[in-house]
Amino acid sequence: MKITAALLISGAMMLSLCACGGTAEPNPVQPTETPAPITYTKEDGRLKMEETYNSNGLLFSTIIYEYDEKGQLVKQAEFGISDAPTGYKSFEYDAKGQKILMTSFVADTAKDYSEEYRTNYEYDGNGNLTRATSTRDGKIVSVTAYEYKDGLLSNEKNYEGESFVASEYKYEYDAGGKKTRCVRIDNIEGDTSENRYTYTSDGLLLADLSYDADGKVISRTEYSYDDNGNAMKLSVYNAKGALISSTSNEYTYDEYGNIKRCAVTHSDGSKGTTTQYRWEYAKG
């Protein structure tokens, strides 16, 4: 049974879990509103095309993915309204299959492109990413340096330019390799914060506690799941333990166990967005 395509009828995704980290690549400007329906097309198990439509059902943007004979992504071409090219990203790999270069181009005309920035990647002998350096016009824009302990990411430093450490993340793990602590140092704002994580017996995130620089609890976020491991409810509490907000997901599944629908409800009783999925299956 091979999934060849999936269609998201509405754009908001399910409960997102806490992410603690940064990126070395410049962040592109995001639109204030994201068009809702997205169609994904897969071929031979690989994502080939992603089409985004606006609320009126008109094609808003398209991303086409190209791969080499090894199955490595080598190009990500982006198009806007009326299939007008907006830019593309190219990727290069070393003999080990490790991505060593990503170059981003922006479309000047329908046929002409200019380089926007590039990111070089470096690895240690174990294949762990140790450094990502982004440059624009030959000048270093940002660097992210990674350190590992026992094969797990232990430290991440995000530089603005070559030398100024804008932020730093320190990670700790339990015996099973689950992240239990993340300390974030913000050298721009002069602030330090911390997150501590606990998990269910199945390894799913159960609670995320946020602390300030003095070690006082700022907030607590709790998660619950259904039997399939999908997030069912997210509850946020303040420092005094009072419920601030909660969001619940309700799922329905098709005969193959894939999600058909996810309906979101907020703690005030208001309905959030509903995401519907249509899966196409290859015969045989």
Residue ranges and their predicted role:
Residues 1-11:
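Positively charged n-region of N-terminal signal peptides that target proteins for export
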